Amino acid sequence: MYTYAGYPAVLCVLGLFRRRAVRLDESYCPRVILIISVHNEERIIRDKIENSLALDYPKDRFRIVVASDGSVDATNDIVREYESRGVILKAFQRREGKSATLNRAVLGLDADVLVFSDANAFYREDAIRKLVRNMPDEEIGCVVGKLVYVSNHSYVGRGESLYWRYESLLNGLESRLKSVLVGTGTIFAVRRALFSPLIKDVANDFQLPAEVASRGYGVVYESGAVAYERSTFFFREEFSRKRRIIVRGLTGFKALRTNFGGGFRMFQFISRKLIRWWVGPLLPVLYAVNLMLLSNPLCLTFFVLQNVFYALAIAGAIMRRGGVQSKMLLVPFYFVMVNAASFAAIVTYVMGRRLASWEKAETTRDAHEHAGFAPQLRVIEGKKDLSYTGKHKGMENLEHIT
């Protein structure tokens, strides 16, 4: 329970005594380059570029770079159509993975701030302004934006939306201490001067915040900088994605452990990530221990509760396959799925497999195709229904709950 409830409680207490305010300046407009990582994104790259061009930021202070990692579809041709509007294509023939692609793309770029994004993430119109308003504070080296999932009403989609609301809560609590642990790969900004070459098997949104913090700069969360992304639909896609993230996280920790040292950042990593990742492998162990100690009333109670919880998760899986969904079964189903993925990830890591190339979830692209990201979708942010009325390109009909 510590990793889910105890750690947030510790952050709340620390925030009362160690809170460090950020000096904001709404008029601050540094030179910004938005880097979009892509691999075979012909279905949505046009909408992404249109969304990026429509962002509210001075055009003479803003450039868009599309870093294409071995794309063999029409992605590069579509991007070239926008070169007359200032979009820069950096196309690399050989696929080497996201980190290698970003390293090559950043070479020679002259800017004050780099913003990293993916093709399937659509920014709210003021997202860049909200990110950089934190940068006049010279203590700040990295700013993490808010990812909001557009739910497809599947168990997996709703579960992921719930998970990211929890992650956003942690980001907000850590931000009070100017020490957000990890970035959000679809929307985060780093000072150009603080960018360092990315390690092949390590996620950029894990490595860059860690290295920025190790150099004495703060990492903060900006809830006003919003990116919308469609959640996955299929179990196998989300399972594979979670497994990949955890493997890369473990790889990153091994490669960057000196950056964490033995101080607060190490405490954060253990509390927020490492313990959580090990919950999956420990659940079967806990089940077996309780089974062997049924004569103990406390162990018997836990054993019964475990069986009830797993039964609810199985019921949720069965009902999902039958097209029936229950909110009551969502949490057990998603919890078991995520921890099964963490178990698989640790096995993968121990066996020595590393995942340098990113494999996109196809259903996160399906809703964009021929629709300009304007199907009747919902973003789960709270309980109240509001009609989305923003002017952001490709998002006109988006409905969300806030």
Model-derived regions, located:
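Catalytic donor/gating beta->alpha subdomain of glycosyltransferases that bind UDP-sugars
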Residues: M135-Y166, K200, N204-I270, A340, ...
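Acidic helix N-cap motif at the loop->helix transition within catalytic regions
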Residues: R43-D47, V72-E81
